[in-house]
Amino acid sequence: MTLLIKNGRLVDPKSNRDEVLDILIENDKIVKIGLNLSVENAEIVDARGLVVAPGLIDVHVHFREPGQTHKETIHSGAKSAAAGGFTRVVMMANTKPILSTPKVLTETLEIADKEDIKIDAVGSITQDFDGEHLTDFDELIKAGAIGFSDDGIPLTDAGVLRKALQKAKLTDSLISIHEEDPNLIGTLGVNDGEVAHKCGFTGAPTVSEYSMMARDSMIAYETGARLHIQHLSAGESVEVVRFAKNLGAKITAEVTPQHFSITEQMIFEQGTNAKLNPPLRSTTDIGKIIEGLKDGTIDVIATDHAPHTREEKNVSLDKAPSGMIGLETSLQLGLTNLVAKGHLTLSELLTKMTVNPAKLYNFDAGYLAENGPADLVIFDAENDYQVGETFDSKATNSPFIKQKVQGQVKYTICDGKIVYQAK
């Protein structure tokens, strides 16, 4: 297949390129980038007035298959990703059964391989998330695991984490960690602040996150292994990551769009759709997170796409599951709350959604270059619209429904094929 993208604003953070150019794609590769390109029998995509960027990469999604396909399937998750401009995603291990064995992982990846986007997966750190017994890292890597995480459940035993990091270092594998100490938490999913107190319960204080993060960062420093901090939410957590990096620890960190966009007050408006682990925090926390994004302390923006059904969410705040979908609003929230407000340039935003996620797992992705992969997103960076009530995801649990955002994905191209086109 030959595809010719004409007159788009090519923004490639890896090469610091930002100029109007044409891109010629043949099969799964970019073969030419230049001005006034033409070729016979090519399908033309008119990108005039639009941004052409590397396909987005999300290193933190929950596609719920196997075992919870009433919430999401790999297929519906892949469709949601493509609609959001993502050409590659990494699934977490908290399926049913958990991705703890080569058999379950292999079967899951065989399903994922049928989709139009690239889907990878991590294996669990501990067997069935028991927090005690490590999985067989070597066998899981052979089965296709690109890293390890017990995301959704923190590793409370420091000794287990240390053993996991020591083992991961032998294969240069990435360990990704959910940082919330359950011993310091009352009710999960709600900040221990004004909202929780008005609701009459104790929530999840910021110390439950940054205290565990400090412990784990120092263990990573001691072992020399690579540790990735998932979905940090507290201002103090940014300081911990900054300190650990300055010390020389091989630490990377991610933040979700919701944690730099809205506060715990959103629970009063959106109810359980704004209940998340870790919870939404304060305006002060958002300010420190934005500073961490600006100075490079926070490396990656990831969605933590976590679908639930309406029935599951339509219960009391203390009983509802935590999580929200995010693949179809991620780029827009970055454009709206970071770029439009002058916190990041467009290239800086894209770095945290393409180049840096690719670095975590050594993907050949996240850049636009001749002979490089034909994975791209084409979007209108300035178009305002209201987030709808339906999504390509099977789920609708988003606190951003009816919110006005900036930016709209027009095309997603993966391996040289148009896998999403706006209607």
From Swiss-Prot:
Protein name according to UniProt: Dihydroorotase
Cofactor binding, per record: Binds 2 Zn(2+) ions per subunit.
TM segment ranges: none
Gene3D superfamilies in alphabetical order: Metal-dependent hydrolases
This protein's pathway: Pyrimidine metabolism; UMP biosynthesis via de novo pathway; (S)-dihydroorotate from bicarbonate: step 3/3
Residue positions binding Zn(2+) 2: D151, H178, H231
InterPro entries reported in the protein's UniProt record: Amidohydro-rel (IPR006680), DHOase (IPR004722), DHOase/Allantoinase_Hydrolase (IPR050138), Dihydroorotase_CS (IPR002195), Metal-dep_hydrolase_composite (IPR011059), Metal_Hydrolase (IPR032466)
Catalysed transformations (reactions): (S)-dihydroorotate + H2O = N-carbamoyl-L-aspartate + H(+)
Residues annotated as binding Zn(2+) 1: H60, H62, D151, D304
Keyword terms of this UniProt record: Hydrolase, Metal-binding, Pyrimidine biosynthesis, Zinc
Function comment: Catalyzes the reversible cyclization of carbamoyl aspartate to dihydroorotate.
Natural source organism: Lactococcus lactis subsp. lactis (strain IL1403) (Streptococcus lactis)
Highest rank taxon of the organism: Bacteria
Enzyme class: hydrolase
EC number from the UniProt entry: 3.5.2.3
One MF annotation (Gene Ontology) recorded for this entry: zinc ion binding
Binding sites annotated in the UniProt record for substrate: H62, F63, R64, N94, N277, H308
Cofactor: Zn(2+)
GO biological process terms, semicolon-separated: 'de novo' UMP biosynthetic process; purine nucleobase catabolic process
Any one cellular-component term (Gene Ontology): cytoplasm
Family assignment from sequence similarity: Belongs to the metallo-dependent hydrolases superfamily. DHOase family. Class I DHOase subfamily.
NCBIfam families assigned: PRK09357.1-4, pyrC_multi
